[in-house]
Amino acid sequence: MDQKFPVKKVSLICAKGSIEDVYASLIMANGAVMEGIETNLFFTFFGMDAITKTRMDKLHTGVVGNPALRLPGGMRMPSLLGIIPGMEAFTSWMMKGQMAKLDIPPVSEFLDLITAGGGKIYACKTAADMFKLKKEDLSEHVSGILTIGEFYERAAGEGSQIIFT
C-alpha cells in the first residue's frame, strides 16, 4: 500500500550562525513557503546572528575544522589553512561572491521573501536573554521572542515536521 502523508507544516530550528548553516535554514524555509506549506523558522544560540540587525548580513564561513570546505572548482582546502590570518574573511567573501552569481539573496532579503510568503520567524527567549538581545535589536521580520515550549505549540499538528539545521 503506497500511502502519501503530505507535509502541512514545517518548523525549522537554526542554532548555528555560519553562512552555510543559516542558508540551509533559509533555503528550506523559502522552499516550504513557495510550496504553500505553513512555515515557522526559530533561531536560537548562534543562529540568532541571522536575525540580529547588526550581524545578519555579516555572517562568515567557519574554516577551521571544516573538512568539507572546498574552493571554487572543487579543490579541497585543508582545514589547517584556516589558521592563517584573514582566511575566514577571504573564504566568506568568496562564498558570498558565488552566492551572488547564483542570485541567492542576502539574509535580510531572504527573511523578507519568507515573511512575504506567509512564513513566521521567531527568536529563542533563552538565547535572547543570554546574549542580552531585545526585540528592537532583531530584524523587523521577527514575529516574536518565544520559549521553546511556545515554539513547540506552534510547530504541533498533523502533517508537521520539525527540522533542526
Q: How should these model regions be labeled?
A:
Residues 59-95, 99, 103:
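A glycine-rich helix N-cap at a beta->alpha junction
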Residues 88-154:
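A charged, amphipathic interaction segment
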Residues 47-60:
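N-terminal beta-loop-helix "entrance" segment that forms/cooperates
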